Amino acid sequence: MALRSINKLNVFVKRCATTLLYCRHKSAPSALNTNSASSPTSTNSSRNNNNKNEDDNRNNKNGFSGYSWRSAIRFFVPFSLGALASTMVAQREELTPTISARTLNGRRREFNFIADVVAGCADSVVYIEIKDTRHFDYFSGQPITASNGSGFVIEQNGLILTNAHVVINKPNTMVQVRLSDGRTFPATIEDVDQTSDLATLRIQVNNLSVMKLGKSSTLRSGEWVVALGSPLALSNTVTAGVISSTQRASQELGLRNRDINYLQTDAAITFGNSGGPLVNLDGEAIGVNSMKVTAGISFAIPIDYVKVFLERAAARRKKGSAYKTGYPVKRYMGITMLTLTPDILFELKSRTQNMPNTLSHGVLVWKVIVGSPAHSGGLQPGDIVTHINKKEIKNSSDVYDALADGKKELDIVILRGVKQMRVTITPEDP
């Protein structure tokens, strides 16, 4: 643009040169008359000046004197540069808003890929509430919410997938499902596998939005994923992150009797997100949100493992023999827990200052269900169970064994930060 303006300036000056030449020749006779009336000395001086001007004119290919060019430059250059600057500013003011708007709109469409994923699959995510039928709200008279979680629709006729720990092990309760459009339905539990921590629910409604199931075997570390659910009863909540590992063995997490390689992600999976989908950028579920250890470390059950569970559940339904599988229902305490393996302990110690360096084993209390025996006994999320009835607790299986002992009360030693405490819990019979 600047070169184009300079070329225009050059053409402008050349066109004005003719006018300058004409003005100079028009003024020449008067100059000669003046010289003829002067003294001889003046005549000689004028003749010398005329000879000098003629020499200058011969040296200048355009036929202008040095004085004439200097006059032209002295007049036209400031004027033309001002015009050039005005033209450039005007063109810039005209073009800049258009370029900025086009660029920003393009960025919004190009980089808001998370919003596109959510728009395509959020309608299939549901909120699950577990209502305690023995306790009622003082004002509404309705059963209070004992716990909550998430799930997602996998069949149009009302089949919903979630975690087993969301819907079982709480006696005297009922399950309620709220859809993304606000409609609420009672639900029945169809299949439960506590070994894999998976369950299916059924609500009596048709033509629901269905979540597409992808392939977790094709995932790579570093891929973007989106976790959907209802943390803390906040429906339709979205968090995003990347896959940190595609092969986190259950043994590394201290989960015995589970032959699962979990998906590890830094997408936030908090209370209430359990059972919700972990989806890829194609809007396909590639995992089921399961648990969180600490900020930036969460785990999901791979969808390929989930498909095996769903195939077996479908076969049982066809035979009319759908039933609960896995561990038998034990006495109820009301917690979700995670074994503290050496790797998890290292991560926790590096992220917090409130953990003793001497701690080498235990079970982390990840979630406490409100109104449960654990809640009534004083357990809190973040507590670390180290002993039950004077026996060391090294993994979650030791806690299940303590529940199966049949003792009426459990004397539990916990670490809350750096402080050691004791709590007493009376589990409920199934």
Swiss-Prot record:
Residue ranges constituting the PDZ domain according to the UniProt record: 333-418
UniProt-annotated stretches for the region Serine protease: 147-310
Record field: compositional bias (Low complexity): 30-51
Membrane topology value: Single-pass membrane protein
GO molecular function terms attached to this record: serine-type endopeptidase activity
Active site: 165, 197, 274
Superkingdom: Eukaryota
E.C. designation(s): 3.4.21.108
Signal sequence region: none
Positions of region (Disordered): 30-61
Function: Serine protease that shows proteolytic activity against a non-specific substrate beta-casein. Promotes or induces cell death either by direct binding to and inhibition of BIRC proteins (also called inhibitor of apoptosis proteins, IAPs), leading to an increase in caspase activity, or by a BIRC inhibition-independent, caspase-independent and serine protease activity-dependent mechanism. Can antagonize antiapoptotic activity of th/Diap1 by directly inducing the degradation of th/Diap1.
Subunit structure: Interacts with th/DIAP1 (via BIR 2 domain).
Protein family membership: Belongs to the peptidase S1C family.
Annotated protein name in UniProt: Serine protease HTRA2, mitochondrial
Organism, as annotated: Drosophila mojavensis
Gene name, Swiss-Prot/TrEMBL: HtrA2
